[in-house]
Design a protein with these regions (language model features):
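DEDD superfamily 3′-5′ metal-dependent exonuclease/proofreading module
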Residues: 1-48, 52-214
Length: 214
């Protein structure tokens, strides 16, 4: 299938790919990533969509087919040690990608963890709250619980999905400033480095267990 047949341009900034990223797509050394699934149970709910952005205002979205377990170009990016992957709530997305493709995503940066380390004055660490406070940007979460397993996703769904990655680079910059100011950059990196292991624990039967507790 030709790329132009496989890829559907949703808007100027949103591009939908069927099954995998194009082989020649270079998103650079810092890539924002998010996933949409059928639900929160890895044993039941499949991965449906993977969104990626290089921070240039363009969102590439890979629609995953039912029972698909291989996406070579996407997996190559996920496992590339030279590319830092930015997530919001990386723990879930790393586990979802590992469960779907058997690939462990690393290295990673999680804006939710960074927020918890520096925004200790609040318990509101959702992406919408972070963007409102740090970037003065408002995004809609109306499509969050919609049917992501559909053969044809709506423009509204894809606009929502894109919004989850388009701002993560700028958000990381703001959070890094605060982490540096509070002397917690090294602590944050240690947390990020543990996330792939935390995701493996989630998939191996310890999703609600703190193995470090008494």
């Amino acid at each position: 299938m030709l790329d132009e047949e496989r890829d559907r341009i949703i808007t100027v900034t949103n591009i939908l790919h069927k099954g995998d990223l194009p082989e020649d797509l270079d998103l650079g050394p810092l890539v924002a990533i998010d996933c949409e699934t059928m639900g929160l149970n890895f044993n039941r709910d499949r991965l449906c969509l993977v969104q990626l952005s290089s921070g240039n205002g363009v969102a590439h979205m890979v629609q995953i087919e039912v029972e698909q377990n291989f996406a070579p170009n996407l997996c190559k990016l996920l496992s590339n040690e030279e590319i830092l992957k930015i997530f919001h709530f990386a723990r879930f997305d790393i586990a979802a990608l590992l469960n779907a493709f058997g690939v462990l995503t690393r290295p990673v940066y999680c804006t939710k963890i960074a927020s918890k380390l520096v925004r200790t004055y609040t318990d509101r660490h959702g992406l919408k709250n972070l963007l409102q406070e740090l970037l003065d940007t408002d995004i809609s979460k109306q499509q969050q619980s919609s049917y992501w397993g559909a053969d044809a996703l709506t423009d509204a769904q894809l606009e929502y999905a894109a919004s989850d990655v388009l701002y993560l680079h700028k958000l990381k910059d703001e959070l890094d400033l605060r982490l540096q100011r509070e002397g917690r950059l090294d602590l944050a990196k240690s947390c990020f480095d543990f996330l792939p292991t935390r995701a493996k624990l989630d998939l191996s039967g310890w999703p609600e267990t703190d193995i470090f507790s008494h």
